[in-house]
Amino acid sequence: MLQLSLFPENTIHSNKFPTTRYQGSKQRFVDWIWKCIKDIPFNSALDAFGGTGSVSFRLKEEGKEVTYNDILIFNHIIGKALIENTNTTLSDSEVKILLSKHRDTSYPDFIERTFKDIYYTDEENRWLDVVSTNIRNMGNPYKQAIAYFALFQSCIIKRPYNLFHRKNLYVRLQDVERSF
């Protein structure tokens, strides 16, 4: 996946890369990596094991042309949304359409059936089925990637400790005193 920079004046810039607790993420080291390579003369870079895209994103912010790669499809989607995409965004009306159930659309219940009582409540699983179907129905691949990325981030935030390594929905649903 190659970052296109045909129209740099339309490039989307952000000051902060979205964080996750993704095992193996280089986000914690990205400033150190940049410090080590910034004086090397180069215009392009290959991020062969792109993962969350934190290194590619930083290089893009520094004006470098980045080729991003990752074997996992959801990471490929993140790369398309944050690295390859230069000027596509979602409007408020598009977000509203994504978050709404539509009478003329048939929604599967795959997430609701498959992941019952594992990561999210039944209502949240139904909502995920609706939103993921609406994303698949979008025509623009960059808008799809942005929407999926936002959905991934919202799913991570909703999880205890931002992790998916075990069935622990009960941790979030317990009625206990919290210090945060």
Briefly describe each language-model feature range.
Residues 65, 71-180:
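Class I S-adenosyl-L-methionine-dependent methyltransferase module
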Residues 55-59, 67, 76:
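Charged, often flexible domain-edge or linker segments that flank or initiate folded functional domains
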